[in-house]
UniProtKB/Swiss-Prot annotation:
UniProt cross-references to PROSITE patterns, sorted A to Z: HELICASE_ATP_BIND_1 (PS51192), HELICASE_CTER (PS51194)
Family indicated by similarity: Belongs to the helicase family. RecQ subfamily.
Any GO BP: double-strand break repair via homologous recombination
Source organism of this protein record: Rattus norvegicus
Protein name: ATP-dependent DNA helicase Q1
Residues annotated as binding ATP: 113-120
Amino acid sequence: MASIPALTDELESVSSELHAVDIQIQELTERQHELLQRKSVLTKRIKQCLEDSAAEASGDCDTSPAAWSKEDFPWSGKVKHVLRDVFKLQKFRPLQLETVNATMARKDIFLVMPTGGGKSLCYQLPALCSDGFTLVICPLISLMEDQLMVLQQLGISATMLNSSSSKEHVKCVHTEMMNKNSHLKLIYVTPEKIAKSKMFMSRLEKAYEAGRLTGVAVDEVHCCSQWGHDFRPDYKALGILKRQFPNISLIGLTATATNHVLKDAQKILCVEKCLTFTASFNRPNLYYEVRQKPSSAEDFIENIANLINGRYKGKSGIIYCFSQKDSEQVTISLQKLGVRAGTYHANMEPEDRTKVHTQWSANELQVVVATVAFGMGIDKPDVRFVIHHSMSKSMENYYQESGRAGRDDWRADCILYYGFGDIFRISSMVVMENVGQQKLYEMVSYCQNISKCRRALIAQHFDEVWNADACNKMCDNCCKDDSFEKKNITEHCQALIKILKQAEGLNEKLTPLKLIDAWMGKGAAKFRVAGVAVPALPREDLEKIIVHALLQQYLKEDYSFTAYATISYLKVGPRASLLSNEGHAVTMQVKRSTQSSVRAASPEACEVDSKGKEKSSAVLC
């Protein structure tokens, strides 16, 4: 008969093996989900390739970019002349020639091209080669101002109409729209002008009938779709343009749209059978890095200033901030540390924004500290760094903002500082957006990831097929020598649920910061739970555990709306009940070693602190 100790030993062995199997099952389930998503993407890609092949075989081959890459069209000579003599360029970038030719042939087209790929040229050049004018719809007045400044420097006649335009200016533009001898080639308006101005629509109709309106360009076309990252209701009214003016060519442009968003936007704009040209998302010269944001604001600013005055000394850059207030404060702090910085945000006077933009373009300012209002349409080629003072509200925004670096195809760095508190500041801002929280969590997941190639993560988001080996160690994760393991954090998640339930029983709500304080045995004693030990981990690690639990839906956000602010609280999430199952395990990827072993892609890829020691750029311990 077996002894009790022997049976106990075997029981422990079986329990241990079952626990290991549970972890493997969870990992396999997660992998299955990833593979099913990738299978769906690949199936759609194969279907599209088969449709393209069938179209080519039937002679209907104008859907392929290759059909538009020739230089023997009737307009090719004029196109080449304008490219060289007006835009001062010797050659086209990928897909520019194809898009210009399709537009000149009066085809409707959607162009998906990375930030910095040269989308604006694809409608500006055809406008100069046509007899009439092209109407350009842009979401931001600041974007239109930036575009006009560049066009004026090139000697191109362009203007804009907005709510602040004087009656005299509006009257002058309306006259030019009908003048066959006018040199006006581009008229920029916001979508509100189309949706709400009957007078302007009447003028457009007369211009169309007179053969003066030759094209429409819808910039940031993803704004049409409620599934896009920056949905704007007035964009939905733009379908009237193709219905009223069927013979014009319409081009929709974006750097950040998934296939689902593109299809939705095409339907809204009444161009469901348009051509779609998609450039590769990859910018091989950009180095992507995520860093933990220092807890001290003073240390953080000093950290950024050391980078700018050291590695990036004399080099041009952009710093993106969460709010207008942040951008102003960061600018002042950097100026005190010897950085030639200027602020840029939408609430500034137009002449002040233009002044900052002009000074930065002329390298009189080294850095622009800005909100998202800055950058769309910016064509400064030698931006060597884009620093995010806080993360973007979505992967689409981050891809677009970081893409303003390195347009000259030389190496540039994209450094994102990721902080726990930023998640909930941004969440409170996007909660009213249709998919705002979902897109924010995708961004957070990107920041939390400590092992997967950054380009692979971006590719996965945009439904691209990507081989991580092609990164060429141009991201922080691909530069790491660290090995990783799955750490069981089930007990930590159970502790969080107990604290939240105790608060709920007291009819109290906990903000993320109060939850951490209660977990660490700080703050109000009423939130501390008997039997929940204070974890022997630094606060930074506890923050990452909470974020992981939030992303995995063991926790969820709840909001309280006041007259002055939207406040984020944490509550028990929909998957929390699983934590009471004995076999259920929550795991999180961590470094196997506590020592940093970051191998830089270049000598510049590691930050050097004030004492000359290399700091790790790893996000999670």
